């Protein structure tokens, strides 16, 4: 009988089955901390690969940009039309300290403002804040009917449009160049810059729905940990005030006795 290979017996594959490793075992979670300007400080968590050799986990986190709705940061649904960008600048323990990196308005909000028979006016300018940030601010506004107007349309002439645009740029530069980044963000949340533009342009042509459409951070100053900690620490107004400590009656009586003894 000839000895040969049995063709019916199938060979097993080389290496066999590989073990399925869960990729999340090599990763860890970090908490995201928002600056003091917002009410909700812990706004989420982020995932990063664990430190392996010379590759540190913190290096993978620095510079990450997170886009969050202002409604989530301030716990107010009325502010859901604005999006805030926060950039991770430093890591302390398992906390990622973020700072403001820009803002924009949602598309559905912009589409809801567009109306028939009204003019749209836009302007933008580059501003440098007192703490060294260079911002590019975009403003948008719409014409408004004058009281008692009978005409159905509310269009603006190109000559007046140029004047309104000039006033928009002046207000944006005045409001942002004289304050720090922290104060600029505080002005954007309640739309106070838009209200100032409406007041300034009232004499030229009445405007409505004026708001800062977008802010881009073009240039940042050199990283300083102390300045970042100032943004993340809430300094109460009461610090630094002198407090008057009332003396007890016994202490006052002892003092008068000593003075009487010295005089005698």
Curated annotation (Swiss-Prot):
InterPro entries in UniProt: Ribosomal_eS1, Ribosomal_eS1_CS, Ribosomal_eS1_euk
GO biological process: one example: translation
GO cellular component: cytosolic small ribosomal subunit
Domain of life: Eukaryota
Keyword Cytoplasm: yes
Keywords attached to this entry: Cytoplasm, Ribonucleoprotein, Ribosomal protein
A GO molecular function held by the record: structural constituent of ribosome
Location(s), subcellular: Cytoplasm
Assembly and binders: Component of the small ribosomal subunit. Mature ribosomes consist of a small (40S) and a large (60S) subunit. The 40S subunit contains about 33 different proteins and 1 molecule of RNA (18S). The 60S subunit contains about 49 different proteins and 3 molecules of RNA (25S, 5.8S and 5S).
Entry similarity comment: Belongs to the eukaryotic ribosomal protein eS1 family.
Name of protein: Small ribosomal subunit protein eS1
Organism of derivation: Babesia bovis
């Amino acid at each position: 009988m000839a000895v040969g290979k049995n063709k019916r017996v199938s060979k097993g594959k080389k290496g066999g089955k590989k073990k399925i490793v869960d990729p999340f075992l090599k990763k860890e979670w970090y908490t995201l901390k928002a600056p003091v300007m917002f009410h909700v400080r812990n706004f989420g968590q982020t995932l990063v690969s664990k430190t392996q050799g010379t590759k540190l986990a913190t290096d993978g986190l620095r510079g990450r940009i997170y886009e969050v709705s202002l409604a989530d940061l301030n716990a107010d649904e009325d502010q859901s039309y604005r999006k805030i960008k926060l950039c991770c600048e430093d890591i302390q323990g398992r906390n990622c300290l973020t700072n403001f990196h820009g803002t924009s308005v949602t598309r559905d909000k912009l589409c809801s403002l567009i109306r028939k028979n009204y003019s749209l006016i836009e302007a933008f300018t580059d501003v440098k804040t007192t703490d060294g940030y260079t911002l590019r601010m975009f403003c948008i506004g719409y014409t408004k009917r004058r009281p008692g107007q009978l005409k159905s349309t509310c269009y603006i002439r190109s000559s007046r449009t140029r004047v309104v645009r000039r006033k928009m740029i002046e207000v944006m530069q005045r409001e942002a160049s004289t304050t720090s980044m922290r104060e600029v963000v505080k002005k954007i949340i309640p739309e106070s810059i838009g209200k100032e533009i409406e007041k300034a342009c009232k004499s030229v042509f009445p405007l409505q729905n004026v708001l800062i459409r977008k802010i881009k951070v073009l240039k940042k100053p050199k990283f300083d940990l102390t300045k970042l900690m100032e943004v993340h620490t809430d300094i109460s107004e009461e610090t630094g005030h002198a407090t008057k400590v009332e003396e007890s009656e016994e202490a006052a009586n002892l003092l008068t006795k000593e003075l009487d003894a010295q005089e005698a």
